Regions:
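C-terminal motif of bacterial Sec signal peptides marking the signal peptidase cleavage site
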Residues: 22-23
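Glycan-processing catalytic domains of CAZymes
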Residues: 29-321
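Bacterial N-terminal signal peptides that target proteins for export
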Residues: 2-12
């Protein structure tokens, strides 16, 4: 999936995505559809391509039971079909390299399904922070593996997300000690060097990355005990900084339904209220204050499709009071 769908399909995408929010499962998905569609009518030509962050670890010990396995091809086919029905054109998948065999296998199966359904996938590479002395080599080796197995070779490679012909790789930092300049130099030797995108704007990394993406965050006020900080100031700062200071960098906006990690084994008791569906609707619309038909936002990332452990999943709809 690339810029070929940027104007027509992405306009349809945002239009179909603004529908989610009620009480039972069917009406919750209908509201999700409505929310996504209401957004599209405002600027029919420069809509961003809509993606969703995807977690591939369900069915593996250590994660909650959500009723399915991320390695079940039937589940993956259903998820792709449902995402497309909402106007989502691709999944950005948490990936740790081949050392995490369950997630790597799930990603491989998902890319196979995507390739047969005109759907895109991309890697969200989680930086390895377990062994600080080897994070740079790990990143280079893992990304080379991704290139050889998912981006450059095989029948499913056509499903890998591209922008202006180049593969897109998202990087999720974990406070490691990765030398991203070395990583950049390594991937630049590929026949088709990727676009590397880093979470949040970091002026120190402007020379090593092609752009930055937003991620769920409460904003300057931090995590409020009552969940009232829904991320408005964070998104305003991200879009303002990208348009004013880094207009030549690739920007990926974000939207989310809320956040609640109290079910996760690693919980830090962080809460962002769904505000009866307003958090998703407001975060989904906010980019329009900074982007338009003349200066379109390339991508909008929904955080997330199915992270039930952090309370950001839209797969089954978003709740309405």
């Amino acid at each position: 999936m690339n810029s070929r769908i940027f104007h027509l399909a992405s306009a349809l995408a945002l239009s179909s995505i603004l529908l989610v929010v009620v009480g039972c499962a069917g009406s919750r998905r209908a509201d999700l559809h409505q929310t996504l569609r209401q957004n599209e009518a405002r600027t029919p030509n420069g809509e961003p391509e809509v993606l969703a962050a995807y977690q591939p670890w369900f069915g593996r010990p250590g994660h909650i039971n959500v009723g399915y396995s991320s390695q079940d091809p039937a589940v993956l086919a259903r998820q792709v079909a449902e995402a497309k029905d909402l106007g989502i054109s691709g999944f950005v998948v948490n990936w740790y390299g081949p050392s995490h065999a369950f997630e790597d296998r799930a990603y491989s199966l998902l890319q196979d399904v995507a390739a047969g359904n005109d759907f895109a996938v991309a890697i969200l590479y989680d930086e390895n922070s377990d062994d600080p002395g080897h994070t740079t080599d790990d990143a280079i080796n893992d990304l080379n593996y991704a290139h050889d197995h998912y981006i450059a070779a095989g029948a499913s490679a056509r499903a890998y997300l591209r922008y202006n012909g180049r593969p897109v790789i998202f990087i999720f930092p974990k406070d490691g000690h990765t030398d991203w300049q070395r990583v950049r130099q390594a991937v630049n030797t590929w026949p088709d060097p990727p676009l590397l995108l880093y979470k949040d704007v970091d002026p120190r990394l402007v020379g090593d990355f092609d752009g930055f993406y937003a991620w769920v965050h409460p904003g300057r006020g931090g995590w409020a005990a009552d969940g009232s900080n829904w991320g408005q100031s964070y998104l305003e700062h991200f879009y303002s900084e990208m348009t004013s200071q880094y207009p030549d960098k690739l920007a990926v906006g974000a939207a989310w339904p809320g956040f609640d990690d109290r079910r996760a084994s690693w919980s830090r008791n962080r809460l962002m209220s769904a505000r009866c569906g307003k958090t998703f609707a407001d975060s989904l619309h906010l980019f329009r204050r900074y982007y338009n038909d003349q200066r379109p936002l390339p991508f909008l990332l929904i955080v997330t499709w199915n992270d039930y452990e952090e309370g950001t999943a839209i797969e089954r709809g978003t709740g309405k009071c």
